[in-house]
C-alpha cells in the first residue's frame, strides 16, 4: 500500500509541476475581475465550498461548478446529467433514489436505517433522503460538486463529497423573467418559467415553476402493466428577498413539488440473470423441494395441471422475461409513484463590519409512496409497496470574518438537525405459484405477505470552526475542526399474514391478497411508548393493483427498539500557495464520517447490533491555473483516501435460516488523479476535456456471504469421493467448497453437507474493486458561436463522455460488470437575439445501453436499472 501511495503521488506531483511550469501571463483573478473579452477569456465562477463566496480558482479544494448558462447550454437537467461532465463522478439510480459515487465512495443503503454518503444541499440546507436528489433543476444559479470528504464545514454524511445546488435569488430593482419549453421523444413536454418582481427598493420576489409530462422510456409489453420512468411532475418556488440596508439581508424561500406516474420501480426494474444454473437448484414449493426447470422461468409449482391461459398439461417453456433490450419489460402490475415535498428555507445575514452573522434555517416535509412488481414477470405473483415519510428541521448559525484586508479568514458555527422518519414496506404474494416465476423464488401454495414498519429519529448537534492565515505573502495555512453528536432512536415491528389453510388453494387463484388489519400497536415498539405517527388504518391505503381479502389476519412476529449516540470529531489541515496570481498550489489532509445506525429484522437482540460510523482520511494535492491571458484553465488534483469501518451487509445463521444485518466489517483505499481543462482561444470558441483515474479496492473485506444467504455449496464434506465438475476436480473427498455469485470462495472448513447454508462461512474478497468505481472516466467537449450577422448566432455543441468497465457489486462477478462505454450528446442552438434561443438536442446519440445499478434480489436473481436510452428533443428559451 505504501508503495502505491508513493507512486501515485509522485506521478501526480510531476503532472502538477509541469502544469505550473507553463508560461503564465499574470492577471488579477480576485473578485470583480473581468474576462478578457477581446481574446475570449474565461469567466470566473463564484462558489461557496468554504461557506463563503470565493472565486473557484482561489479555493484549495477539488470542486467543479456550473453557472445557470452552462446548465442550460449543456443540458444539465438533473444530478444524473453530471455523470462524465464532472471528473470521477458516476451516477447510479434505483427507482427514484440517487446513488452517486465519488472516489470509491457510493451510496448503497437508502433505507430508514441508513444515511447517504454523498451530501446533497439546496441553498445550504442538507436533504436527508436520497430521493430528493433526483428532482429536476429549476431556475438554478449554480451547481457545485465537491470531491472528497467535507466533514469540517459541512459535517455528517459528506463522507465522499457534496452536491450543492444554489437556486436563483431575487434581484432588487429589476423586472426579469424567463420561459423554457421542452418537447421531445416519449411524449415529453416540459415548461419552466420564472419571474422576478421588485416590490420596493428594498424588497423583491422571484417565483419559479415547472411542469413536466412524459410517457416513460421503459416499455411494458404487458397490457396489464405500465411503462416505467414516465414523468408527471410539478414544482413551484417563491423566494422573497429583503435588504433594508447594506448590512442586513433576508431571503425566505417556499417550495412545493410533486412527482407522480409509474416511477422507476423500487430497486431494479429488470432481472438480467441468475448467478447459478437454476435448472439444477432445488426450490421450495409449499415447503416441498422441487427443481427449477428453465433458466428463463419455467414450471416451478411442481404440479402438472391446467392453468388459465396455459398449456393443458404443462406450463414449462413459456418465457417470463420480455425479449429484447434493457428498456423492455413484461410485468402485469401497474406500478405507482406518489411523491410530495414541501420546504421552507430562511437565509439571514448581518454584516457588523468585518464580521458577518449568518443564519440558515430549513424545514422539509417529505413523503413518497412507491410500488413495484416484485416477481418481475407477467404473472400475478407478488408486489411490493413502500411508504416513506420524513419531517426534517435544521438550524445553522455562522459567524465569519468579512475583512478583506486582514491576513486571517475564519468561520465558526453551530448546527442542529432533527429528522423524524417512518418507513412502511409491504409484500404480498398471491395464492399458488403459476407458470414462469422469477428464478429461485420460494412461495407457499396459499400465498402470503408481510408488513414491516420502521420509525427512526435522528437528532444531531455540531460545533465547528475553520481559519485560514496568510503566513507570508501568497502562502496560507488552513486548520479546521468539527465535533458532531448524533442521537438516534430506532423502532421496528414486523407482522406476517396468517392465511386460511383449507382447500387447494384456500382462496381462488389470481386473487390479490395483502394484510388487512389495523396499525401495529404502539406497544410493539417497546420503550418508544405511545406514538402519534402510526396513522394507517388499512395496509396499504387503497391503490390500483391491491385488493384486500377479508379472511386474512396478521400476527406480530418481531419487534425491536434501540437508542444510541455517535460522537465524532472531524478535521482538516491545508496549505496553499500562489505561485503567480493565476497559479495556485495546495495540499490538504481531511477526515469525514458517515453516521452509525441500527439493524432491523426478526431475531434476538444479540443479532441486531448497532453499527458505528464509517470513517475516511483523505490526502490531496492539487493545482489551479489560468494561462495565456486567461484563455486556458487547467485544474489538477491527486488524492489518496483510507476508509475504515465500512458499513457492509452480512448474513448470519439464525434458527435454520439467515438474517441480513449491517456490520462495520471492512477497510478500503482509493487513490487517483483528476484533471479539468478549458480553452477559449477566441471569442465564441470553447474546447474542454476532463479525465479521472481511480484505483479503488477493498483491503479488508472477509466473511462476506452471497446475497441474502444464498451461497451455493457445491461440495459435500460428508462424501467419500472427490467432487468432479465438467471433468475437473474442485474438491477432494471430505472437503467442501463454496461459490458465491460468479465468485469462487474457495475451500471452507467444517463438516456440513450440501444442504447446509454457506452464509455462516462466507468469502474473503479483499482486493476486489469497489462497486461503481471505474478506473477511467472523462469527457471531451467543444462549442462554437457562429456569427450570422443580423440573424444572430448559431452554436453547435458536442460532448463525448467515456467510462472504463466497472463492477456493480463487491463480488466482482462477470454478471455484475458494466463494460466500458462512450456516450455522445449533440446540441445545436440558434439565438436570433440576446433574449430568444431555440435548441435541438440528441442525448446518447449512439444509444449506448448501460447499467447504472445492480442489486441481488431474493433467490439469487440479479436485478438491474439501465441509464436512459437515446432521446431527442427541442428547447425554446425566452428571457426578458
Model-based region annotation:
Residues 799-811, 815, 829-880:
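C-terminal beta-signal and adjacent terminal beta-strands/loops
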Residues 347, 351-352, 358-362, 367-372, ...:
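Membrane-embedded beta-barrel scaffold of Gram-negative outer-membrane proteins
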Residues 2-74, 80-85, 246-247, 344, ...:
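N-terminal Sec signal peptide and the immediately downstream disordered periplasmic leader
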Residues 30-32, 477, 640-642, 663-810:
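Gram-negative outer-membrane beta-barrel transporters
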Residues 164, 173-174, 180-182, 198-293, ...:
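Periplasmic-side early beta-strands and strand-to-turn transitions of outer-membrane beta-barrels
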Residues 40-172, 621:
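Acidic, small-polar-rich N-terminal luminal/periplasmic segments of exported/outer-membrane proteins
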Residues 115-117, 129, 138-141, 147, ...:
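Outer-membrane beta-barrel translocator/receptor signature
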Residues 218-229, 264-330, 374-382, 424-453, ...:
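Solvent-exposed loop segments that connect transmembrane elements
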Amino acid at each position: 500500500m505504501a508503495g502505491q501511495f508513493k507512486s501515485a503521488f509522485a506521478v501526480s506531483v510531476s503532472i502538477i509541476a509541469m502544469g505550473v511550469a507553463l508560461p503564465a501571463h499574470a492577471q488579477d483573478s480576485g473578485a470583480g475581475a473581468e474576462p478578457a473579452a477581446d481574446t475570449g477569456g474565461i469567466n470566473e465562477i463564484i462558489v461557496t465550498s468554504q461557506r463563503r463566496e470565493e472565486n473557484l480558482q482561489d479555493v484549495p479544494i477539488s470542486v467543479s461548478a456550473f453557472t445557470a448558462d452552462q446548465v442550460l447550454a449543456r443540458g444539465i437537467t438533473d444530478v444524473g446529467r453530471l455523470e462524465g461532465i464532472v471528473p470521477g463522478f458516476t451516477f447510479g439510480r434505483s427507482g427514484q433514489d440517487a446513488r452517486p459515487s465519488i472516489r470509491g465512495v457510493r451510496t448503497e443503503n437508502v433505507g430508514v436505517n441508513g444515511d447517504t454518503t454523498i451530501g446533497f444541499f439546496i441553498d445550504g440546507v442538507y436533504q436527508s433522503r436520497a430521493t430528493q436528489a433526483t428532482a429536476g433543476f429549476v431556475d438554478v444559479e449554480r451547481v457545485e460538486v465537491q470531491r472528497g470528504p467535507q466533514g469540517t464545514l459541512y459535517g455528517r454524511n459528506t463522507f465522499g463529497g457534496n452536491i450543492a445546488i444554489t437556486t436563483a435569488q431575487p434581484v432588487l430593482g429589476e423586472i426579469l423573467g424567463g420561459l423554457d419549453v421542452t418537447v421531445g421523444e416519449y411524449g415529453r413536454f416540459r415548461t419552466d418559467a420564472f419571474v422576478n418582481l421588485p416590490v420596493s427598493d428594498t424588497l423583491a420576489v422571484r417565483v419559479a415553476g415547472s411542469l413536466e409530462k412524459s410517457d416513460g422510456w421503459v416499455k411494458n409489453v404487458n397490457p396489464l402493466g405500465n411503462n416505467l420512468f414516465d414523468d408527471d411532475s410539478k414544482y413551484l418556488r417563491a423566494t422573497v428577498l429583503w435588504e433594508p440596508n447594506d448590512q442586513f439581508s433576508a431571503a425566505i424561500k417556499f417550495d412545493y413539488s410533486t412527482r407522480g406516474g409509474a416511477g422507476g420501480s423500487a430497486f431494479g426494474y429488470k432481472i438480467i440473470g441468475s448467478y447459478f444454473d437454476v435448472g439444477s437448484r432445488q426450490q421450495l414449493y409449499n415447503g416441498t423441494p422441487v427443481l427449477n426447470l428453465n433458466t428463463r422461468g419455467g414450471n416451478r409449482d411442481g404440479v402438472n395441471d391446467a392453468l388459465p391461459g396455459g398449456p393443458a398439461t404443462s406450463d414449462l417453456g413459456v418465457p417470463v422475461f420480455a425479449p429484447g433490450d434493457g428498456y423492455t419489460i413484461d410485468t402485469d402490475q401497474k406500478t405507482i409513484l406518489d411523491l410530495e415535498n414541501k420546504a421552507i428555507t430562511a437565509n439571514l445575514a448581518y454584516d457588523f463590519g468585518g464580521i458577518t452573522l449568518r443564519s440558515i434555517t430549513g424545514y422539509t416535509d417529505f413523503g413518497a409512496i412507491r410500488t413495484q412488481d416484485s416477481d418481475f414477470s407477467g404473472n400475478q405473483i407478488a408486489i411490493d409497496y413502500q411508504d416513506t415519510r420524513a419531517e426534517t428541521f435544521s438550524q445553522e448559525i455562522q459567524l465569519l470574518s468579512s475583512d478583506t484586508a486582514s491576513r486571517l479568514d475564519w468561520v465558526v458555527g453551530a448546527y442542529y438537525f432533527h429528522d423524524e422518519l417512518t418507513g412502511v414496506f409491504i409484500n404480498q404474494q398471491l395464492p399458488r405459484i403459476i407458470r414462469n416465476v422469477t428464478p429461485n423464488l420460494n412461495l407457499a401454495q396459499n400465498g402470503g405477505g408481510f408488513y414491516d414498519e420502521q420509525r427512526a429519529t435522528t437528532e444531531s448537534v455540531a460545533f465547528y470552526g475553520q481559519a485560514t492565515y496568510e503566513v507570508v505573502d501568497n502562502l496560507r495555512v488552513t486548520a479546521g475542526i468539527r465535533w458532531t453528536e448524533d442521537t438516534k432512536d430506532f423502532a421496528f415491528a414486523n407482522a406476517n399474514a396468517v392465511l386460511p389453510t383449507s382447500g387447494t388453494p384456500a382462496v381462488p387463484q389470481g386473487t390479490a391478497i395483502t394484510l388487512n388489519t389495523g396499525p401495529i400497536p404502539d406497544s410493539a415498539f417497546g420503550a418508544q411508548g405511545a406514538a402519534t405517527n402510526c396513522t394507517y388504518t388499512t395496509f396499504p391505503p387503497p391503490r390500483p393493483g391491491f385488493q384486500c381479502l377479508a379472511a386474512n389476519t396478521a400476527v406480530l412476529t418481531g419487534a425491536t427498539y434501540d437508542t444510541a449516540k455517535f460522537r465524532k470529531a472531524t478535521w482538516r489541515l491545508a496549505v496553499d500557495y500562489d505561485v503567480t496570481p493565476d497559479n495556485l498550489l495546495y495540499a490538504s489532509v481531511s477526515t469525514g464520517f458517515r453516521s452509525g445506525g441500527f439493524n432491523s429484522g426478526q431475531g434476538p437482540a444479540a443479532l441486531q447490533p448497532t453499527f458505528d460510523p464509517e470513517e475516511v482520511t483523505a490526502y490531496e494535492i492539487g493545482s489551479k491555473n489560468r494561462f495565456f491571458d486567461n484563455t486556458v484553465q487547467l485544474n489538477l488534483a491527486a488524492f489518496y483516501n483510507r476508509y475504515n469501518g465500512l458499513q457492509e451487509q452480512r448474513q448470519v445463521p439464525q434458527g435454520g435460516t439467515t438474517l441480513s444485518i449491517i456490520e462495520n466489517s471492512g477497510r478500503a483505499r482509493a487513490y487517483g488523479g483528476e484533471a479539468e481543462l478549458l480553452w477559449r482561444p477566441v471569442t465564441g470558441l470553447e474546447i474542454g476535456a476532463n479525465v479521472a483515474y481511480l484505483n479503488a479496492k477493498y483491503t479488508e473485506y472477509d466473511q462476506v456471504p452471497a446475497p441474502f444467504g444464498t451461497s451455493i455449496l457445491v461440495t459435500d464434506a460428508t462424501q467419500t469421493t472427490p467432487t468432479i465438475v465438467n471433468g475437473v476436480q474442485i474438491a477432494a473427498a471430505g472437503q467442501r467448497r463454496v461459490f458465491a455469485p460468479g465468485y469462487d470462495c474457495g475451500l471452507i472448513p467444517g463438516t456440513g453437507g450440501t444442504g447446509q447454508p454457506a452464509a455462516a462461512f462466507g468469502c474473503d474478497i479483499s482486493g476486489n474493486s469497489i462497486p461503481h468505481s471505474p478506473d477511467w472516466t472523462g469527457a471531451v467537449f467543444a462549442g462554437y458561436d457562429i456569427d450570422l450577422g443580423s440573424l444572430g448566432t448559431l452554436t453547435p455543441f458536442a460532448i463525448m463522455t467515456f467510462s472504463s468497465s466497472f463492477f456493480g457489486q463487491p463480488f466482482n462477478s462477470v454478471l455484475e460488470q458494466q463494460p466500458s462505454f462512450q456516450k455522445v450528446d449533440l446540441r445545436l442552438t440558434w439565438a436570433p437575439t440576446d433574449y430568444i434561443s431555440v435548441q435541438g438536442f440528441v442525448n446518447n446519440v449512439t444509444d449506448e445501453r448501460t447499467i447504472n445499478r445492480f442489486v441481488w434480489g431474493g433467490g439469487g436473481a440479479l436485478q438491474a436499472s439501465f441509464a436512459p436510452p437515446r432521446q431527442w428533443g427541442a428547447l425554446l428559451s425566452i428571457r426578458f
